[in-house]
A protein has these predicted regions:
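Amphipathic alpha-helical binding modules
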Residues: 66-93
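Generic structural signal for well-ordered, non-transmembrane alpha-helical segments
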Residues: 16, 44-47, 82, 86-89
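Amphipathic alpha-helix face/heptad-repeat signature
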Residues: 11-14, 56, 77, 84
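Short terminal alpha-helical segments
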Residues: 1-31
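Charged catalytic carboxylate motif
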Residues: 17, 59, 80
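Short, charged/polar micro-motifs that form catalytic or ligand-binding hotspots
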Residues: 8, 29, 50, 70-71
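Amphipathic alpha-helical interaction modules
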Residues: 20-62
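Flexible loop/turn segments at the boundaries of HEAT repeats in alpha-solenoid HEAT proteins
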Residues: 11, 51-54, 93
């Protein structure tokens, strides 16, 4: 089952913005490897087209939601995570 038609331009733009933010976190040398690993999984999740946009954004919010509580994460990365969550919260079915 393909959800290709449900990916509006607004949703695709939001996903691209989130991917840019995640790539920025991955290229930051002060970010621990476990957080970079989760960021990579989130990028892969956002690239899938076999689920609805709301399901994909919910999956990503769940994955990175736990990262904000990680004591090893730098403050600027925590702010980026909150920004990503606020972008993805707008996507609904």
């Amino acid at each position: 089952m393909s959800f290709e038609k449900e990916f509006t331009k607004e949703v695709l733009d939001t996903f691209e913005n989130v991917k840019l933010l995640l790539n920025g976190m991955m290229s930051d040398r002060s970010v621990p490897r476990n957080i970079k690993r989760v960021s990579q999984k989130c990028i892969e999740e956002l690239s899938r087209k076999d689920e609805s946009p709301a399901v994909l954004s919910s999956n990503v919010m769940y994955m990175i939601g736990d990262l904000s509580q990680d004591p090893n994460i730098p403050f600027h990365s925590r702010t980026t995570i909150y920004r990503i969550i606020s972008l993805l919260e707008k996507i609904k079915d």
